[in-house]
Amino acid sequence: MKIQSIFAASFCLLSSISAHAAIQLTVPDEVELILVDNQEVKLESSFFSTTSTLDLENGKHQIVFRYNPVFKQGKDNIIVSSDIIVSTFSAEDKEISFKFPTYNSPEKAKAFNRDLNWELIDKNNNSIPFAQSQLIYNGMQVGRNIQFEVAKFNTTEHPAAFKEGMLTVTHKEIKNEQGENTAEQMLHYWYEKADQATKERFLKSITNK
């Protein structure tokens, strides 16, 4: 009887959490999601997939991210990293994803920092309104305290600022398949691009180590 009661209580709790997680944000592999609603996001890796999803409550949210498209030039892989973008949006009961321009070279991708021509769209390709700003830092980029910078930004009256009292992340962990660092992102990217024979050789090489 006691076990049944515990099970019932757990089921009710999970149902309650699930009922409030009404926004699903899909994160592509070229997006480095840094903060959500002033919180660091822990990424869970799964090697063979390249998409991530984040469940959020209905309401207003702030995302902080970099856009890192990857280009192949000869034998080299070139990553073009944008400045950090701070964006605030509101939504209810939506499946939301990022939409970026298509660039065919690293040189053209550098225009993204100037144009900031990305979108948030729902599953019907409708745009989700948002405010945005770049988090510009003129000093050494290594060792930046981005969370502190964003907290300072959020004290301003900028439309993209995130104020206390807004709803927060329902699940701090993202169901992620892109990895936490550039090296792992590269592995995911080129594994997906490889033919079946190359994939099999790669898998054999890591299982034999």
Swiss-Prot record:
Signal peptide location: 1-21
Entry annotated with the keyword Signal: yes
Name the InterPro entries for this protein: UPF0319
Q: Looking at the keywords, is Iron-sulfur present? A: no
Alphabetized UniProt keyword annotations: Signal
Pfam families this protein is in? DUF2057
Coiled-coil regions listed in the entry: none
Q: Which PANTHER family match?
A: UPF0319 PROTEIN YCCT
> What's this protein's family per the entry?
Belongs to the UPF0319 family.
Annotated protein name in UniProt: UPF0319 protein VFMJ11_1730
Q: What is the lineage of its organism?
A: Bacteria, Pseudomonadati, Pseudomonadota, Gammaproteobacteria, Vibrionales
